[in-house]
Structure formats: C-alpha cells, structure tokens
Amino acid sequence: GLSTCSGVIIGMGETAEDLVDVAAELNRLAVDSLPVNFLHPIEGTPLGDRPPPGPADCLRALALFRLTNPRAEIRAAGGRERCLGAAQPLALFAANSLFVEGYLTTPGQRRDAAVEMIDRLGFEVETAAAEMDRRVQV
C-alpha cells in the first residue's frame, strides 16, 4: 500500500547531464510520484542571487522526466508559475499533476486558476477528494 515519491529542483546549477542522470536513476528506482520544482530564488538564501530557469529549460526538464519515467506521476510543482510564465499551460503536456495554493516557502497558483487553465486545454481534473467521493458512493 505504499508509494514512492522523489523529486527535483531545476535551476540549482545542475548540468544537462546531471538531469539525465537523475531522471534515469528515478526510473531505475520506479518512483511513483515525481515532483519537478523550479528554483524560486529568495533573497538572503544561498541561492537568492541565482537567476531562475527560463521557460524553455523548464519545459525541457519536464519532457525529460516524462520520457524517462513514463509510468510516474510527473508533478509540475513549486516555482512553475514564476519560471514558466505564459508558457505554464504547456507544462501539462508533460506533467499529469500540479501542486497548487502554496509551497513550503512561496505561494502557489490558486486552485480555481489552475482548474481554469486545465479546462482551457481540454484536460479533465482529478483530485484526491473527487476520487474519495467516488469510493464512498460505490
């Protein structure tokens, strides 16, 4: 009954080779859930002066993790709003899950805005609460 979750933060100084290596290792480990976070530099922290990754780098990373981990739930997570900007909807072509409404250190996209974005793309929203409702009704 347990599932595994292990993720990454894109933009902390890793190379393309580093990303390929971690994507392959997470595949080898058969991780069930793979959150892909994007560096959101915060002033006063060790990486506070580092520029965040751009949209193209973020989308490439999501595509890499999707292609190397086809059975995993790829979760576009922290920093996606800032780093992807207007390209954020494109993340859903590689990711099949979003984190919304707040991360550990930064606010996140509001749930209603995320649902609207998903609807505009023609995707369906599934939530743990909706799944629980279906189980209770059976």
Residue positions per predicted region:
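Active-site glycine- and acidic-residue-rich loops that bind
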Residues: 9-23
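Auxiliary Fe-S-binding modules of radical SAM enzymes
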Residues: 24-138
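Radical SAM/AdoMet-radical enzyme domain recognition
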Residues: 1-6
